[in-house]
A protein has these predicted regions:
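N-terminal leader/targeting segments
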Residues: 1-27, 108, 124, 128, ...
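Non-globular, low-confidence helical/coil segments that flank catalytic cores
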Residues: 33-38, 48-49, 54-58, 64-78, ...
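OB-fold single-stranded nucleic acid-binding module
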Residues: 40-120
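Short hydrophobic/aromatic residue motifs in ordered secondary structure
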Residues: 50-51, 89-90, 105, 186-189, ...
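Short coil/turn segments at secondary-structure boundaries
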Residues: 95, 151-154, 168-169, 359-362, ...
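Aromatic-rich juxtamembrane segments at the membrane interface
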Residues: 106-238, 243-244
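Internal transmembrane alpha-helical bundles of multi-pass membrane proteins
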Residues: 228-418, 422-434
Length: 474
């Protein structure tokens, strides 16, 4: 693990140095009229509409448009009277610089006015995905009346986060902000639901291959329904590699698949290295792959007799293992983390696991009518339970740990965790070896039962008295 961390760090520093040099530009001023094509959907903040664009000279620039203007979509053209670009490297906050680098933006611009030209015939797959998501959101509007419940469904099920910021702040305070952002967790819930329905029907290796194809198709359909967000594409790509390796009979080692998928994505777009979501998602998966077997194995033997307690212990082990390697990264980027994250994630993940499949089935396959309204009432009840769970943790108070660490401090923490992991791994191997030896010796003694009337040969009596055995036995 230490070698893996050092190799990953060296590769990361190499990519970061080359990508920063690629984005480095001086302050640029466009005096005349300039045009920019939108590359992302507009994200509405308190004061601006934030949208990533590409100028006519090929530069990617993050525009902050006034809220009073029309909301642009992917593929639309913005005409600006004049624009001054502030370079990315001149941004004072390191986290904001990393955010711009993750998008490939070389600078920021704040135009006071603009003219919008809608795209007539857009061939963008992302724009098509967003239009599909918008139609599903309109069905949610007809299904749920409460604004807070709609905000939860928008974020948890479809990755649309331009609604209630109050709900998002509550999730963030209890350490469950990742549930509000569609990612690998949500795709995993959908895929597991499909697998749970179809796995009992599988009885041969050929059917298992067809199940892998269905799982891959469901993963990419879910990515399409959520607007082809980057975290969902990342998770679908990783799942695709894992299932292809299974179909072809190749080793499905999670760390190998994880490393290969990260290498491919960074080769396509090196800016992902600066994306906090990219860092957290890969670090969480690596943490689960390394620590979940240790945590779960420790208590599984003792809790095997009670399936319910064993299942709950598995959730606790999963929650703990996912946070071992993500906490140093969170402290480095944000300087704080929630102490309730360990416990709040268990009920919230369970409730989300029921909410996401139910919402998708309702809005995709159930026509308007009595059943549609009944399922809407069940969905609204689940959203209310989620809000009550969050409120119960908020009422406890004092759940924030505020510690800001530097890059060197973060690397030191990871080296300490790596050393501790190696020590625990060695201890587990020694304990397992002792138990295997002791268990085999005990089974050997129980399997060999000497009869009471057993007569030993004479030369064995001689051995017990200290004499040498004869050279030949007649």
């Amino acid at each position: 693990m230490v070698v893996f961390l050092l190799a990953a760090s060296a590769f990361g520093f190499f990519v970061a140095a080359n990508f920063k040099e690629h984005l480095s530009i001086g302050a640029t001023a466009y005096e005349g009229t300039c045009r920019a094509v939108t590359l992302s959907e507009a994200n509405r903040t308190k004061h601006y509409q934030r949208v990533l664009t590409r100028f006519s000279d090929g530069k990617k620039v993050m525009l902050y448009l006034p809220l009073s203007g029309e909301c642009p979509q992917i593929g639309d053209t913005l005409q600006l009277p004049r624009a001054t670009i502030v370079p990315t490297e001149r941004q004072s906050q390191a986290s904001y610089r990393h955010f711009l680098m993750s998008k490939g933006a070389c600078g920021v611009c704040y135009p006071y006015t603009y003219r919008l030209y809608k795209a007539q015939h857009s061939t963008s797959v992302r724009r098509f995905a967003l239009s599909v998501r918008d139609r599903l959101l309109r069905r949610v509007d007809s299904l749920i009346e409460s604004e807070q419940s709609r905000a939860i469904i928008y974020s948890v099920c479809f990755g649309y986060r331009n609604e209630s910021r109050e709900v998002a702040d509550k999730f963030r305070t209890v350490g469950a902000a990742h549930i509000m952002a569609v990612s690998g967790l949500h795709l995993g819930i959908v895929v597991y639901f499909v697998w749970f329905l179809l796995a009992p029907l599988i009885s041969s290796a050929r059917q298992r291959r067809w199940l892998s194809i269905v799982v891959i198709a469901v993963a990419w359909i879910f990515a399409l329904l959520t607007g082809l967000s980057t975290p969902t594409i990342r998770a679908a790509f990783m799942l695709t590699l894992y299932e292809i390796a299974d179909v072809w009979g190749v080793s499905r080692d999670r760390i190998n698949v994880l490393a290969f998928s990260a290498f491919v994505l960074l080769a396509i777009h090196p800016g992902f290295l600066f994306d906090i979501g990219f860092q957290l998602s890969y670090m969480a998966i690596l943490s689960i792959a390394l620590f979940y077997p240790l945590f779960y194995k420790t208590g599984r033997a003792r809790l095997r007799k009670n399936p319910l307690i064993s299942y709950l212990y598995g959730l606790v082990a999963l929650s703990i293992s996912a946070q071992v390697l993500t906490i140093p990264l969170i402290l480095y980027h944000f300087g704080s983390t929630s102490l309730w994250a360990l416990w709040s994630n268990i009920p919230l993940v369970i409730l989300s696991g029921a909410l996401i499949p139910l919402v998708l089935i309702t809005v995709l396959f159930i026509p308007s009518g009595v059943l549609f309204s009944t399922l809407g009432a069940v969905i609204a009840w689940l959203c209310n339970v989620i809000l009550e769970v969050i409120e119960s943790f908020l009422q406890m108070g004092g759940g924030m740990l505020r510690v800001h660490i530097t890059l060197g401090g973060m690397m030191a923490l990871y080296l300490m965790v790596a050393a501790l992991y190696q020590a625990v791994l060695i201890l587990h191997h020694r304990v397992d070896g002792y138990e295997a030896l002791y268990g085999s010796e005990k089974r050997l003694k129980e399997s060999i039962r000497v009869p009471r009337n057993f007569m030993k040969p004479a030369y064995l009596d001689g051995l017990t008295s200290g004499s040498q055995p004869p050279l030949s036995i007649k």
